[in-house]
């Protein structure tokens, strides 16, 4: 109709006039006139070793194989590289989002006047550690306290302990484990040069705990009051511990819990990967720094 010539003007009817007279949107007309059977548009650039439909099973297999919950797309991308499957982070993020494989996220709060813009991590192992406690419930013995200590550089769990009583003396057990393992002996001034970050819990501020730190040569480094960010390394480990062990398993006795914690400590130290260390495990970070220190000596 738009190509038909008007008998009065001797000019063809244009598409705009025809659509206006018929009260028809031009977009609808153009959509109806589109070529049929055309292939859907493809993403530009090279496909890589795997197409999208082939890469998704690898993503699911990687998430199923890891012993941890809540790992994000960056760690999935790193584990794919270890398996010689090369792709981009943005592609992994897109596919995990499309297939609802991303870890759940919490919306952050707007920072107030107390903004923590410093850093509590270190560049060398055995410079600063963090300690904290959490609790869980056992079926036969009730509530149990869990104490642990973490290195602020490698994020390695250097000691962990479960007990029925959450006293100041029990809080020292992970520290004793770490000193024996990392410094070779439990003796006066054995951990000279190490600082320990802790909160203001009654166990950590007690006279006995502080005296034990002084005996070992460890400097006490308490976080600010009502500021858990100051002990953020230990708080992050609490979250990992809960999401991967305490919230997914039940325990009958405290001893069963203690054995499970020791097993988790080994799994975490040798399999949890850390982005800021190039997706290496805590044990790998410590080993590399120890070897570099031995060569320098």
Describe each PLM feature range.
Residues 54, 86-150, 169-177, 181-191, ...:
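Mobile-element integrase/transposase regions
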Residues 57, 121, 214-218, 240-297:
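C-terminal domain-tail junction helix/linker
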Residues 17-37, 260-278:
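K/E-rich alpha-helical interaction surfaces of small helical-bundle regulatory domains
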Residues 26-128, 227, 281-291:
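Basic, flexible linker segments flanking DNA-binding modules
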Residues 48, 198-200, 206-213, 220-242, ...:
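RNase H-like two-metal-ion nuclease catalytic core shared by retroviral integrases
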Residues 12-14, 71, 87, 252:
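Residue-level signal for the short linker/turn that defines the boundary of a DNA-recognition helix
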Residues 18-22, 29, 59, 76, ...:
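Mobile genetic element proteins and their domesticated derivatives, centered on retroelements
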Residues 1-13, 60-67:
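Short, amphipathic alpha-helical "recognition" segments used to contact nucleic acids or chromatin
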């Amino acid at each position: 109709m738009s190509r038909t010539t008007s008998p009065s003007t001797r000019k063809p009817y244009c598409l705009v006039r025809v659509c206006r007279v018929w009260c028809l949107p031009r977009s609808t007309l153009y959509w109806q006139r589109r070529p049929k059977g055309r292939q859907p548009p493809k993403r530009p650039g090279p496909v890589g070793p795997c197409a999208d439909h082939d890469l998704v099973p690898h993503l699911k297999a990687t998430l199923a194989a890891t012993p941890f919950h809540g790992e994000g797309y960056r760690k999935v991308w790193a584990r794919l590289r270890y398996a010689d499957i090369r792709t981009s982070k943005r592609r992994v993020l897109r596919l995990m989002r499309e297939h609802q494989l991303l870890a759940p996220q919490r919306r952050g709060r707007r920072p107030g006047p107390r903004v923590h813009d410093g850093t509590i991590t270190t560049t060398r192992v055995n410079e600063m550690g963090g300690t904290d406690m959490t609790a869980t419930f056992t079926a036969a013995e009730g509530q149990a306290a869990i104490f642990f200590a973490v290195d602020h550089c490698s994020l390695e769990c250097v000691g962990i302990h479960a007990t029925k009583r959450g006293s100041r003396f029990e809080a020292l057990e992970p520290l004793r484990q770490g000193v024996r393992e990392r410094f070779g002996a439990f003796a006066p001034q054995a951990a000279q040069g190490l600082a320990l970050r802790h909160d203001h819990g009654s166990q950590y501020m007690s006279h006995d705990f502080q005296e034990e730190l002084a005996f070992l040569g460890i400097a006490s480094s308490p976080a600010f009051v009502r500021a858990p960010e100051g002990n953020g390394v230990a708080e992050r480990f609490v979250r990992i511990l809960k999401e991967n062990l305490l919230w997914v398993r039940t325990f009958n006795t405290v001893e069963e819990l203690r054995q499970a914690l020791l097993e988790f400590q080994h799994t975490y130290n040798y399999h949890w990967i850390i982005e800021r260390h190039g997706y290496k495990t805590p044990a790998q970070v410590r080993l590399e720094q120890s070897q570099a220190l031995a060569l320098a000596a």
